[in-house]
Amino acid sequence: MSRSRWPLAAALLVLTALAARVPLHAAVVSAWAVGDGEKIFRYQDDSPLKQRNSVWDGSTVRLKGLYNEVLAFQVIVEADGLGARAVEVAVEPPVHAASGKAIGAPGPPLYGPGGTIEVFSEHYIRVRRPTQPLWFYGSEASAPKRMTGWIPSVLIPPDARAGRGGFPIDIPPTSEEVNRRQNTLEVIPAATRQNQGFWVDLHLPRDRSCPAGLYQGRVKVYEAGRTVAEIKLEVTLLPHYLPDENHSNIWLYGSVGVVNDYFPELSREEAERMLKFESHRHRIDLVGGSAAHTSVFDERMMEDYKPYVDGSAFTPEAGYSGPGQGCGERLFTVGCYGSITNRAMADEASTRRESDLWVQWFEANAPGVVYFWYMIDEPGPVQFPWIKEHAGWVHDNPGPGKRLPVFTTREYTEELAEDIDIWAGGRGVNLEQLPALKSQGRDHWFYNGRRPRYGAVILEAEAVDFRVNAWVKYLYGVSTWFLWEGTHWQHNFQGPKGHLHQRVFTEPLTFISWSMNWANGDGVVLYPGRMPFYPEEDRGLNRLLGSIRLKNMRRGQQDYEIMWLAEQKAGRDKVLEIIRSVVPRGLNEVGLDEPVPWSERGDDYDLAREKLLGLLGK
């Protein structure tokens, strides 16, 4: 085409676009809100939640919570097919009309007494090949409803590197739009809308200087520096306090050594503190990846670790603020994943000597902590004679070491009934044996994720998969959920890529075996703010990044505390009646080939939570 014909072609393009009412420039077209229990995919334009949901009536976000609780919601910004430039979301602190007090006033300290507001951009990971029903869900009948597409996962702080989630962010054109624009003469059809989620954490006050009652604020959406949408925000602060102490446990493993590799500017001690602080703020015990958990007993090492179990590490004086302030970790694993079994506890004499030392230290320094010897991981029948021998060395110990509980990741097995003190089943919990085990001072936990019995731990899981496990724990009186890994940034050694670091921001696959068993997102609930191995993915932050999965783990833990408070007021039966309206069955009451019996909608949990709050009274 000659240059003289370009103006005519351009004019025809403009007229055609105007007739179709399609913008010729990138633009935000709308914004709406949804709770923390949903995942809105990037190209999902048919969600009924857009019109109304548990926190959104079409114009206002309404939240309700307790002192010391963290509330969360998402702002979904819709852009046309051309995308949008320089988009960001800001939250004006909600103000109490009578007192003028504000929740989340800007400024330090983080998670301070008056509350804090944090806003993150949501990073999407594309899944083309779904996780197979191996360890993650029992059968196709229990699979998540949507398993492919651009799934929101990582939550990126505003001060991240430009172009890597830092504010403001550009919403790129849809892939279809890019293809169309390769030919300048092609008429642009109606643009495909796309979503960009922003996550908001609202930390409610820790003290009573902010009065209970209604607080009002606004959420603003900016595009290229101008306001393009406003959403009203109302927060009702109830006159009750969410305990700092957790009455149920999430045990998450995270490797200090691996994390330290990604943050070369930090010392090992700084990397460990970063891991501990971030997990503690989400009401999780990140235990097992420190030197204290993988080494033989060492008095000096345990004295260095002691602040994490007595709570002094989680105080403002130690640099910590937020939920769980002053509360220590509730769990400690001796020799995580069997790391000292064949070293310090390889024969009878050394096992008795080592177990004596551990028991004496904990009884003197941390008597409230549940400590145990992680003897072996996921044993099969061939290891049973070996387990009996090693467990006998502990249980027959004439010294204090006989009180060291023996732990393994296996569902209760009659043949080992006298040998194992704490079980963690990957297929659930033997509910028939649980009362008897507890009466003997033993226990049975559940391990990782297994739909339909409890939530899956894969990227394609619903947001509430990580929330429902706390409800299952309360329903059946299970104390602990153990998740095998939260910082699985290097491929597992059982597979062909064990020597490689993962592209956790772009590749969904995080677990692969030699037999090509796939798992998307397994083992990753925390993400690295630095990426020395793939610099193009580096966010430029010397701290950990959260995820929607991590936030729903916290939401579940907070739900459990509300259940605990409600039980003190109204009794367990009334609490169970509300829980069963959402989670009628779980664990081994559900066959692995059944559909999921519990709700997969965040709204249902929110409405049940509202009823639980009602039991607390005014």
What function would you assign to each model-found segment?
Residues V228-T341, E363-F372:
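An acidic-aromatic substrate-binding cleft motif
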Residues E317, G324, C336-D347, T351-V382, ...:
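Catalytic domains of carbohydrate-active enzymes that cleave complex glycans
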Residues A9-P23:
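Bacterial N-terminal signal peptides
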Residues P205-S209, V256-S267, S290, T294-V296, ...:
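The substrate-binding groove and active-site-proximal loops of carbohydrate-active enzymes
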Residues K64, I76-V95, L185-H247:
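Extended acidic/polar, glycine-enriched regions
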Residues A27-S54, G81-D201, R206-R208:
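Surface-exposed binding patches on compact interaction domains or structured appendages
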Residues A417-W518:
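Catalytic-core region of carbohydrate-active enzymes that cleave or remodel glycosidic bonds
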Residues V75, V219, W373, K473:
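Conserved, mostly hydrophobic/aromatic
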